[in-house]
Amino acid sequence: AVTALTAQNTTGVRGILACSPEFLGQQVDAVFEDIRPDAVKIGMVPSKALVQMTADRLRFHRAERIVLDPVMVATSGSRLMETETAAVLEKELMPLALVVTPNIPEAEILAGMKIREKSEMEAAAVKIWEKFGCAVLVKGGHSVSDADDFLFDGRKGEWFCGKRIDNPNTHGTGCTLSSAIASNLAKGYSLSESVRRSKDYLSLALAEMLNLGAGSGPMDHGFALTGTFAE
């Protein structure tokens, strides 16, 4: 289901056109009433009304294995969601999620604390779980923990360590990771195994060093496909 259309390329976003809440609800109903998804990934939801509609329809259809990428703050620190919309997301969507995947700035907001080192990533994950009752994958950045992420599921914590790949084309890495986690959950893997497999996939996609566009381009999602174009 599409929450908003964007006009963008590798150099930046030129415009965002949000769907109406009613049309979003129709999209969700159309999917669940025909080919029920085994997992759901939620990304950018740009308004309070759209957050509320998303939560209402997912509750109605008793959606399972929900992966929520909050998309509240960019890794640069820029706010991507209004404070009022974020409050509705915390109240309505967070409790429905199996796992939420905040970056460091988002985890700081959700946990109400600063994160400067790996022990604080662990503490923030526990605080978020205590507030919302969902598993938490705090995504590290090289300013805190290189490419290491911390998962807390309410019972135990687990580090997923990765090697930082010096690739400037990282557009969509957070969205890719959360989508890959949902895909692996849909295939029947545990949350821990889904995170591990998804991080491996993301690392391989980045390692291909795809170079498209004049700005920060995407990674190579189709790296496993081989062959050449016809001349």
Where are these regions (language model features)?
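Conserved N-terminal subdomain of the carbohydrate kinase-like
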Residues: A1-T75, R79, G227
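Short glycine-enriched, charge-decorated loop/helix-capping segments at active-site entrances
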Residues: G12-A18, S78-T83, G112-R116, D166
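Conserved phosphate/ATP/ADP-binding segment of small-molecule kinases
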Residues: T83-G157
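Short, small-residue alpha-helix embedded
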Residues: E108-I109, N167-L191
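Short, charged, surface-exposed loops that flank catalytic or proteolytic processing sites
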Residues: K114-M121, A186-R196
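Short pre-catalytic strand/loop immediately N-terminal to key active-site residues, enriched for Gly-Thr
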Residues: G157-H171
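Charged C-terminal helix
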Residues: S192-E231
